[in-house]
């Protein structure tokens, strides 16, 4: 449960059924892909046990010219759950912390309420395209 697989779930050159309709103007890219992936968030202090790790799953649209990424949209979170079955997670969010023509790094955060409130954080890097 530690690593969430990254799956390309849509390619605008091949697939008909969009998963997340892009907000970007078509002129700025040749095609786009939607990826489904996730980030594992860990806590510190009283919440540092790996048994409390949280998985945040999300979709992200990435725009390409030729084989190079030229932009992206805000990730769309689809869920948060305990990697090992723990509960009490809320407020999942994922942002793109950096990206280049062939790589994208995400930062995930969520709250865990279990006797106290803890902030869980993690990062995930995916290769493009």
Please provide the spans of the model-predicted regions.
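Short acidic/polar mixed-charge low-complexity motifs
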Residues: 16, 52-54, 116-118
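Mature extracytoplasmic domains of secretory-pathway proteins
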Residues: 46-103
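Generic short beta-strand segments
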Residues: 36-44, 76-79, 107-113
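Short, ordered beta-strand-loop transition motifs
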Residues: 13, 25-26, 97-105
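N-terminal prepro-regions of secreted/extracellular proteins
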Residues: 1-48
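Short, exposed beta-strand-loop hairpins at the edges of beta-sheets
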Residues: 107-129
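Residues that cap or initiate secondary-structure elements
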Residues: 13-14, 66-68, 112-114
């Amino acid at each position: 449960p530690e690593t969430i697989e990254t799956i390309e779930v849509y390619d605008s050159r091949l697939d008909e059924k969009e998963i997340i309709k892009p907000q970007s103007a078509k002129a700025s890219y040749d095609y786009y892909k939607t990826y489904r992936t996730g980030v594992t968030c860990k806590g510190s202090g009283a919440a540092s046990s790996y048994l409390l790790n949280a998985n945040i799953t999300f979709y992200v649209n990435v725009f390409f010219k030729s084989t190079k990424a030229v932009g992206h949209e805000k990730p769309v979170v689809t869920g948060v759950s305990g990697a090992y079955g723990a509960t009490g997670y809320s407020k999942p969010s994922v942002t793109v912390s950096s990206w280049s023509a062939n790589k994208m790094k995400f930062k995930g955060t969520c709250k865990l309420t279990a006797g106290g409130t803890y902030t869980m954080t993690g990062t995930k890097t995916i290769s493009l395209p």
